[in-house]
């Protein structure tokens, strides 16, 4: 009996692996963004662990399998997809090590594999995921316009995609970075359709508010920013009480602090204390009302607008003199008068 060659063994092993999971529901990683400082920045995808030698061996095996001219078409499509995914993973792992040439090489190969798959197998049932990964590969290799075009294609062809909220959020991020704020606003709004339980809900609200702010629609941006605070500061399980900022994760804390900051700036552009009073009344006096007054007053102190600062602090005391924070703001009002 003839023993199969090494390449034959590889083909058998790879085919077995592919046939067992050809239709498994792989799901791309969805990491929330980290928003820091006042200036909004794009979402940061959590760094992958560096790919070790086992991945390199898998890449080699898939390449050998694809060399087999009699490979099953369905399994060949699956092998192309998996090889593309592995190359993309390798490139992202190298990015952690700042090996730019390796990123370009692995990312370029992933792009070539995905585009070949889409061309050769237009009816492959997992082309939605192939396009999703292709967009990631374009982003990894610094080609945002091609990434955007691919994400647009996904949005048009696969409206029911599980990762649709992430697709729209990423579209928004690219559009926002290109200063196409009106289009970014629509993309973030579409991402919000996933609901409050969506992985990109708070980030989409935040950037939706920023998109309006960047278009000069300052007052219109406030409801989106307030919904960020509603989602992060209102403790629904504890009688809608204020959730302590200091107990939040770093990412959530930065998101909340930046939201409070941009809202303070917006109120300062409007009518100061009067604007906060009207906004809080319209929102039904949310549990974080104290923070809106406090942060606006602090901003006015930074700008040496001491009379305005005192007016804001006093406005909160007048609105809710029995609040536990009222004495604190009353003292801050006195201090602002003293400085002015």
Where are these predicted regions, by residue range?
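Acidic, polar-rich low-complexity tracts and alpha-helical solenoid repeat scaffolds
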Residues: 21-340
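Terminal low-complexity, poorly structured segments
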Residues: 5, 14, 144-147
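Bacterial N-terminal signal peptides
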Residues: 11-19
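Bacterial N-terminal signal peptides that target proteins for export
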Residues: 1-10
